[in-house]
Amino acid sequence: MHNQEEWLDKDKTLVNEEENTCINHSYTKKDTNNYRVGKSGIKDLKKPTNQKEIAIKNRELTKQLTLLRQENNHLQQACKILSENKIIENRKSIEKWRTICEMELSFILNSTLIKINRMGGYKDFLEKEMEAKKRRLEYQIDNGMEDQICEIKESDDFRQLSEVEKQEWESQMNEQLKELEKKKIAELEKLNKVLHDSEGKDFGMAELCTRLKLDYSLIFPQ
């Protein structure tokens, strides 16, 4: 019996030692893993950060945020305008504005037609106007360029040039005169086309708006 108890104690001791060995081994392994994770985290903390890249990224994000805030404000204002009361108010304001514009333009048109009739009618008025534009165009291109050439030739700088340089300059001026002559002819053709297209037409509200640089369709919607 005594020997049996010793055997049991011995066996029990063997079991406990085996369990303790497993527990100690597991604990040691866990501690090792924990140590490795902590070591990796320390390495990550020690990685150098590029402050310049962070600053650039911060500026870009700040700019995007500002634009988004502006867009949000615009959308909020649009929502307010699109509310039912605002739409009605805006329509009333538009109609009032159109009524005032129509009245003012009608007065200007009547006054202009009286002057045109005194000049012999719309055709005579337009011919005189086109002739005045042609004379102004010819003076600006021909006389203006000739005056500039004369001033340059009489200057001290031009006199100091060699004969070769003077010839080169005159050649360049002749080319410029040819280009200006082409432009003058093109502009004169446009003026002649205006006269041709006006045949059988009268001075009306649409032409008045064009001359006043107003959008006819805004005041007189179809």
UniProtKB/Swiss-Prot annotation:
Q: Where in the cell is it found?
A: Nucleus
Question: Does the record bear Transmembrane helix in its keywords?
Answer: no
Keywords annotated in UniProt = DNA damage, DNA repair, Meiosis, Nucleus, Sporulation
BP term (GO), one:
meiotic DNA recombinase assembly
GO cellular component, as recorded: condensed nuclear chromosome; nuclear chromosome; nucleus; Swi5-Sfr1 complex
Question: What does the record list as coiled-coil region(s)?
Answer: none
What family, per the record? Answer: Belongs to the SFR1/MEI5 family.
Question: What function does the entry list?
Answer: Involved in meiotic DNA-break repair. Required for the recruitment of DCM1 to meiosis recombination hot spots.
Cite the record's note on assembly: Forms a ternary complex with DMC1 and SAE3.
Protein name (database record):
Meiosis protein 5
